[in-house]
Design a protein with these regions (language model features):
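Flexible glycine-/small-residue-enriched beta->alpha junction loops
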Residues: 99
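Glycine-rich FAD pyrophosphate-binding loop
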Residues: 1-13
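Short loop/edge segments at beta-strand edges and connector loops
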Residues: 3, 87-88, 137-139
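Alpha-helix N-cap/helix-start motif
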Residues: 9-12, 69, 117
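Conserved active-site and cofactor/substrate-binding residues in soluble primary-metabolism enzymes
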Residues: 14, 30, 34, 86, ...
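Dinucleotide-binding Rossmann-like beta1-alpha1 core, especially the glycine-rich loop
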Residues: 17-94, 103
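Helical element adjacent to the flavin cofactor pocket in flavoenzyme catalytic cores
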Residues: 107-143
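Short beta-to-alpha linker loops that shape the active-site pocket of alpha/beta-hydrolase fold enzymes
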Residues: 5-7, 91, 124
């Protein structure tokens, strides 16, 4: 494997590591659900640590976006997405520090969270090396 700079020097190194479930397309949702299962058992399936913390994820939308959010969630639940739409008045039971003023709905994904992008990168790199992959860093591909 060739890396122009060093592993994690691109977008991965600047990622906040949010791991969530609901996306607008079934294909993306299926991919992230598989990924979530890997992050939950990263040590067993890949090796190393992912730093995954199941903190839950909240996504607030205005009133005009609520119907689209409800439609997307209804379609994605059949794929295994674990989420619910909260009325802004009920947000306090999940996160009392957020002011719900101006929100039309809040998507709550209790099984989602965040991971450590650097640890995940290192885990996959180590797993690749154990399987015979040579990782060359500081190499630019020109053709």
């Amino acid at each position: 494997m060739l890396e122009r700079r060093f592993l994690g020097s691109g977008g991965t190194g600047r990622s906040v590591g949010i791991i969530r479930q609901l996306y607008p397309t079934p294909e993306t949702t299926q991919m992230v659900l598989r990924s979530l299962a890997i992050f939950e058992r990263f040590g067993e399936s890949v090796g190393g640590e992912s730093g995954f913390v199941r903190s839950g994820v909240l996504i607030g939308v205005g009133a005009a976006m609520r119907p689209a959010l409800e439609k997307t969630l209804a379609l994605q639940r059949g794929l295994g997405v674990s989420a619910e739409i909260l009325d802004p008045r009920d947000l306090g039971r999940v996160e009392p520090r957020i002011d719900p003023a101006g929100l039309g709905a809040v998507l709550y994904e209790p099984g989602s969270g965040y991971g450590d992008p650097s640890a995940v990168t290192a885990g996959y790199a180590d797993a690749a090396r154990l399987r015979g992959v040579a990782i060359e860093q500081g190499v630019e591909v020109t053709a």
